[in-house]
């Protein structure tokens, strides 16, 4: 039914969700309730499909190559609908960037599967965090893994240039400066990202 409706539409916007909470962990990174199958069917029927994700963390996107756009809205609150609509209709530039890494598969994670169930006393288990400080994007960088979307990733309706990068070290403090300029035709905000590493590579996860 969704596929037939999508085929008869000019474009389709699919809202997909994933519920997480302090006392409710997700069993895996797939969208629940067969939402991946729904998105796949809709995108197959209409290539002009956009997906809005309302999730609490990273999810897998097996349908990514078949859709025209993906907007990660997280849990946007009571005014989320208005904000999402303004972004989708181009009234405001999507200037945000990912604060986490979206893996291409669960196998890229340092611990894809946890054996046991912490909610059941007889199935509780200990976890040895052998990855140390190499968590999040630092794990992917350390292992040379290419994620689906890296930490700091974000698209925009405009473009930006960065010039005049300079670094100055004095009194134990590093100061970095450069100029960022909006070179496109749409008003927007650019997020400057600077990554530093030990020149001797002594730390277990090199960039931060």
Predicted regions and their residues:
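C-terminal non-catalytic regions of proteins with extracellular/luminal or membrane-system context
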Residues: 1-208
């Amino acid at each position: 039914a969704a596929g037939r409706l999508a085929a008869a539409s000019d474009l389709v916007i699919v809202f997909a969700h994933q519920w997480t909470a302090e006392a409710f962990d997700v069993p895996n990174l797939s969208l629940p309730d067969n939402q991946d199958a729904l998105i796949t069917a809709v995108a197959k029927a209409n290539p002009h499909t956009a997906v809005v994700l309302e999730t609490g963390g990273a999810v897998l996107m097996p349908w990514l190559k078949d859709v025209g756009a993906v907007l990660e809205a997280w849990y946007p609150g009571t005014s989320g609908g208005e904000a999402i609509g303004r972004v989708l209709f181009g009234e405001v530039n999507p200037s945000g960037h990912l604060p986490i890494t979206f893996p291409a598969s669960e196998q890229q994670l340092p611990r894809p599967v946890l054996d046991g169930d912490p909610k059941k006393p007889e199935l509780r288990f200990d976890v040895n965090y052998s990855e140390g400080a190499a968590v999040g994007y630092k794990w992917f960088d350390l292992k040379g893994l290419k994620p689906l979307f890296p930490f700091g990733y974000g698209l925009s309706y405009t473009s930006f240039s960065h010039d005049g990068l300079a670094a100055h070290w004095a009194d134990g403090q590093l100061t970095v400066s450069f100029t960022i300029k909006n070179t496109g035709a749409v008003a927007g905000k650019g997020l400057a990202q600077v990554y530093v590493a030990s020149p001797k590579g002594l730390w277990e996860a090199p960039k931060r």
